[in-house]
Amino acid sequence: MAHTVALIRGDGTGPELVDGTLKVLRAVDAEVDFVECDAGFEWWQAHGGSSLIPPDSWKNIESAEACLKGPTTTPAGSGTPGSVAVTIRQGMHLYANIRPIKTFEGTRRPLGDVNLVCVREATEGLYSGIEHRLSNDVAIAFRKITRIPSEKVAKTAFEEAKRRGWKRCFAITKQNILKETDALFMDAVRTVHKNYPNISVEEYFIDNFAQQIIKNPQRFNESVVFGTNLFMDIISEEISALVASIGCIYSANFGDDYAMFEPAHGSAPRYKGLDKVNPTATILAGAWLLEYLHEEKKADAIFKSTEAVIAEGRKVTYDLGGTAKLSEMADAIAQRASKNL
């Protein structure tokens, strides 16, 4: 029986990237029924409202087993709706954003090979959306940190290390300044860590870690780096720069019984319709979706085929040093994946 998955095509280059991903998923005969859901900045520009996600789309998202989301644009400025991703994370209680970051054979490695995983608490912190304008000259934002989400994201990090056979985790804080919120977070981490005696955990202040990951990134290979929402949003983006292109970085958001899969990059509206951008991240997000739905062989075929196409370098996009179009790279991955099953 086919799985039901909510599909958000997104803004800018999102629809093209999703089309390329669907082509690859069809090539491996993925047993998925996609339910298309309107959402994003372009939809909001046309229809207005207080949310980037209309009510009908919410119903489909809630009734699906999972969600595959293309990149979306979030409007800036006071009074505009919150992002699609943050809204779904909070609404579906997707407390852990996981971003694997690994260099690919055949690509530039600015500071050598890297292979680690970033885990980010995805529902609270400074992204809770609790902000107030007190006057024309004063605005405040609340950093909400609570025990249960902190324990859940710590458990996710330790479980991810355990699953991969890794022995190290690094918790990112600024506890010397944020003495209450980060103290609570680290207390939750230590509580959970008692259940993982074979995995070490080391606390790093965010400013020091941001420097150390550039000075010696290999020191953190085969480890899981985790922390609160804003800190890990910034750190995971920094670490992603150690890979040839942000177009290769994919991610997933997990709750207890739901998950959303997406590329880690933005919608790149200036490239909309040009068939130009790198489809790797969206395709690998689609592969991870299949793994989540227990179609592991098909997922593995896509992962290996994507790595092979990138390593060959003949059908890759401009950011990887090639001349292929988005659709041509997706075609190459799809053709190889269908043969690898």
Model-derived features: positions:
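Glycine-rich phosphate/diphosphate-binding loop of Rossmann-like nucleotide-binding domains
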Residues: 6-27, 135-208
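Buried hydrophobic positions in well-ordered alpha/beta secondary-structure cores of metabolic enzymes
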Residues: 11-14, 65, 119, 157, ...
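N-terminal alpha-helical transmembrane segments of multi-pass membrane transport
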Residues: 13, 30-45
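Buried hydrophobic packing segments
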Residues: 21, 25, 189, 282-290, ...
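N-terminal small/polar loop signature for handling phosphorylated ligands or for N-terminal nucleophile
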Residues: 39-59, 186-222, 227
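Glycine-rich phosphate/nucleotide-binding loop
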Residues: 43-46, 55, 212-314
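N-terminal glycine-rich phosphate/adenylate-binding segment common to multiple enzyme folds
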Residues: 44-140, 230-234
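Glycine-rich phosphate/pyrophosphate-binding loop and the adjoining helix
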Residues: 52, 129-171, 175-178, 296, ...
